[in-house]
Swiss-Prot record:
Protein's UniProt name: UPF0178 protein BCA_3127
Disulfide bonds listed in the record: none
Xref: NCBIfam families: PRK00124.1
Residues that span the membrane, as ranges: none
UniProt organism field: Bacillus cereus (strain 03BB102)
Length: 146
């Protein structure tokens, strides 16, 4: 198992790196050049920089990921593609994407886009909380223990 992180806006990178390093599982952070960092990472963590274009990180993750790798993303489109490839996919708020829930998530995203396109406003995501982080940590630890 390898872990790939859609890292541009991921608020749980620290949890992923800490827990994966303890478990000796390699982590690849995929992020755009606009989020370049000189921060030192453990040797088991690789950072891949991609262009800032739409979905560039998603495409790179899909090129790298193999069946049974673990991907962390908040992007439903990437999650859908990764599930089809046989990957384990987690959201940073602490839930697992599955073939049972991805269709509903994609449908909700589509309907919200149509509402916005018509000029109306939609609610944004709720703020990320410490409880969300701990929920993610528990799920992540259970997934890498398999």
């Amino acid at each position: 198992m390898k872990i790939y992180v859609d890292a541009d806006a991921c608020p749980v990178k620290d949890v992923i790196i800490f827990e994966a390093t303890k478990a000796k599982i390699p982590v690849t952070l995929v992020t755009s050049f606009s989020h370049y960092s000189n921060a030192e990472q453990p040797k088991s963590v690789e950072t891949i920089y991609v262009d800032s274009g739409a979905d560039a990180a998603d495409y790179r993750i899909m090129q790298l990921a193999q069946k049974e790798d673990l991907i962390v993303t908040q992007d439903y489109g990437l999650a859908s593609l990764a599930l089809a490839k046989g990957c384990i996919v987690l959201h940073h708020k602490g839930y697992k994407y599955t073939n049972d829930n991805i269709e509903q998530l994609l449908q909700t995203r589509y309907l919200s886009a149509m509402v916005r396109k018509s000029g109306k406003r939609t609610k944004g995501p709720k703020p990320f909380t410490a409880e969300d982080k701990e929920k993610f940590r528990a799920l992540f630890k259970s997934m890498i223990a398999l």
